[in-house]
Structure formats: structure tokens, C-alpha cells
Swiss-Prot record:
Required for mitochondrial morphology. May control phospholipid metabolism in the mitochondrial intermembrane space. Residues 1-172 form the PRELI/MSF1 domain. It is found in: Cytoplasm; Mitochondrion inner membrane; Mitochondrion intermembrane space. InterPro entries: PRELI/MSF1_dom, Slowmo/Ups. This is UPS-like protein C36.10. Coiled coil: none annotated. One of its GO terms (biological process) is phospholipid transport. GO terms for molecular function: phosphatidic acid transfer activity. Disulfide bonds: none annotated. GO terms for cellular component: cytoplasm; extrinsic component of mitochondrial inner membrane; mitochondrial intermembrane space. It is a peripheral membrane protein.
Amino acid sequence: MKIFESCHLFQYPFEQVSAAHWQKYPNEHATHVIAVDTLDRKVLDNGVLYTERLITCHQALPRWILKLIDGAQDCYIRETSYVDLKARTLTLLTSNLTFSDRLRVDETVTYSPHPELEATVFQQEARIEALACMKRLSNLIEQWSVDGFGKKASRGKEGFESVLEKINMSVFQTRPFGSSEATA
């Protein structure tokens, strides 16, 4: 098993980041995301907003991986999210549904307010494991997956930044959040 970890500080307040999460796709940095479908949404007894979504992605995979997975390039990911307004956290749990009998990818992302700044802390961990049928190639597959995950995570953060910027500019029309001067 390999683990990918990442931390980032979004220069926007938690309320804006958590609201923007629902508008994250599509964006120009995540063109591999084809569709995001909401399967379930409800407020739990403890007041937490629970949402389950199906994310459809088109992966550009190397030929040697395509041979291992029978040539399928579209994959499905299950995302469950928990928005806890009292604790001021947004937690996302994602797992791949496609190829999960060969390669398991479980990701946890948490957004929470920075304790001192008007910003939001992003923490990400992905556990990637090639399963028994792939043991001979597991290290190679896991490392390739971690490297690819890191690249997509970086583009994902860039894409989310652009979504936040667009929302910020449309909400505050003449000046970005936190700016003291108006823009033309």
C-alpha cells in the first residue's frame, strides 16, 4: 500500500469554500471529470448534511495498464460528504468503484477553517493498494497510481482555486473578498 498526502491553504473563508465544493466540476483543470450525479442528500439526526455522489471520469491510461484492466478508460467514483456546520468541517470520503477488485483507492479530504486566518485548511490523504491479483506488479502499479494521483490532486486544487475565484468575483462583483479597493 502507498499513501499520498497533501495539505493546502485556500485563501477564502470556510463558508465560501464549502459552498463552492458543490460547483467544483466542471472546471478547465479537471477535464477528465465527465459527470457528477447526486444519488442521495439528507440532513442527519445530528444536523450534519450527508450527500452521496457518483463521479464519472475518463482516464488517459498507459497501454500496459489498459491491458490489465481490459481496456476500460471510464471509471466511477463514489463520494460521500459530511458538512458539519457546528464543527465547521466538510469531510469527503471517496472510493473507486471501477477496477476496485484490482486497485483500491480510498481518499479522505477535510476542509476546516484556519484557526487564525480568514482561510480554509485542506487536508488530503489517499490510500492506494494493488490487490492480490496484481501482486506481481503491485509496487509498480501503486507507485504509478500515487504519482498520477499527485498530479491530478495538484490540478484539482488549481481548478478549485479558479472556481473559488469565479464565485468570489460574481458574488462580490466589483472587488474580491477581503480586498479593500474596488476593481474596474
